[in-house]
Swiss-Prot record:
Its EC number is 6.3.5.-. PROSITE patterns: GATB. GO terms for molecular function: asparaginyl-tRNA synthase (glutamine-hydrolyzing) activity; ATP binding; glutaminyl-tRNA synthase (glutamine-hydrolyzing) activity. It catalyses: L-glutamyl-tRNA(Gln) + L-glutamine + ATP + H2O = L-glutaminyl-tRNA(Gln) + L-glutamate + ADP + phosphate + H(+); L-aspartyl-tRNA(Asn) + L-glutamine + ATP + H2O = L-asparaginyl-tRNA(Asn) + L-glutamate + ADP + phosphate + 2 H(+). Pfam families: GatB_N, GatB_Yqey. This is Aspartyl/glutamyl-tRNA(Asn/Gln) amidotransferase subunit B. Keywords: ATP-binding, Ligase, Nucleotide-binding, Protein biosynthesis. GO terms for biological process: glutaminyl-tRNAGln biosynthesis via transamidation; translation. The keyword Methyltransferase does not apply. It comes from the Bacteria. The keyword Cell membrane does not apply. Belongs to the GatB/GatE family. GatB subfamily.
Amino acid sequence: MTSRYEVVIGLEVHVQLTTQTKIFCNCSIAFGNQPNSQTCPVCLGLPGALPVLNRKVVEYAIKTGLATNCSIAPRSIFARKNYFYPDLPKGYQISQFELPICEHGRLDIDVDGTSKSIGITRIHMEEDAGKLLHDDGDTSRVDLNRACTPLMEIVSEPDMRSSDEAIAYLKKLHQIVVYLGVCDGNLEEGSFRCDANVSIRPWGQKEFGTRAELKNINSFRFIKQAIDYEIERQADILDDGGTVVQETRLFDTASGTTRSMRSKEEAHDYRYFPDPDLVPLIVSDDWVEQIRRELPELPEAKIARFVGELGIPQYDAEVLAADRAMAEYYDSLVKAHGNAKLCANWVMGELQRALNDSGAGIAECPVTPPMLAGILQRIDDNTISNKIAKTVFDAMWQSGKDADTIIEEQGLKQVTDTGAIEAVIDEVLAANPSQVEEYRGGKDKLMGFFVGQVMRATKGKANPKTLNELLKKKLTGE
């Protein structure tokens, strides 16, 4: 039974950076081009080709380190990680080992209302390997377009005790790197992928159990499935009196199981040593402070401001802050209109619905914050009702016209003349005498029927507040 054991999880996250070129050469990192069309002597590992470090990669690493509460090393070193694999043309990977650029950070997560701090051991820069393409037969081909693509590896402490905590940490980290603009966050294309180190130990035991490493999983759902399966697998082995083997395992998405890939290597197996072709990286305090000043407002700070300064509920704040572009849209809308809660309702409601229906992102939204603010202002001054406002919004989405033009062209201005509304009410009540008697006999739910009839007669233009007040007076005889 897994309840007999404490779960210990540490994560290694590989983040592909959104630079235009590779980490040590000027080749493009664009995804999906012809195999081996984005290569040069450096990323092909040809003799005599020398690497030159991409400054933007360093900036992105520092930015991520600051956002995850890390210390930035004033001096760091690139090292050669030696191993043989067909997609590694040099026979080694340029990475960082003893002196990474960022260390000793943390991320705070929340699981079921409980907060927890997860330590970050280190963040280091490295190059990606190429990609093996397997044919239907018994041959494989190598595409080296991905070789030398810039990566950050973010290594956590083994502080997570469940798959839920692991997923909360990953989602928080994913949100941060996308917010910073250092990664596009595309899991399907491998821009954000994870290795999970999973072990279990009897409750109360201080020593860690033997861990298995689950490799290159690129879906939050699959990561959770893989961790949960691995916990059960190890518990079954220990319950049967067996010994867990330290190894690397692959997750099979079809069966929902993990299978052994190879024995797990230790650091000494890679024979790390400083890369003689790259000088030590020196990072000045001034450079770090310049990057710190350029950091965007991060999700936690944004949520706190939305709740504390704008007064919207915590749930609304979390939804709006989840995406940086959406949060910036909301901020602009509040500045243009002022009513933070009404703005939140419209962004999370009608705007999100239209985006979902069209498949567009917020960057392609045809309704700008000032345009949407124009609709909300016409709700405020009773020119249109909330229901009519949705019609105006749909027309605005299609035409790009402002609210006043749409209201005027389509004759959508709300009827507020009490005399006109009263006349329609009289007609509706006269046409439905039996329903009037039932209402007066205690069937209060019929109020909705009468409101609907009046709205139908006025084509939805009757002011709802005025309509309800007049209708109630007519029906009760007050």
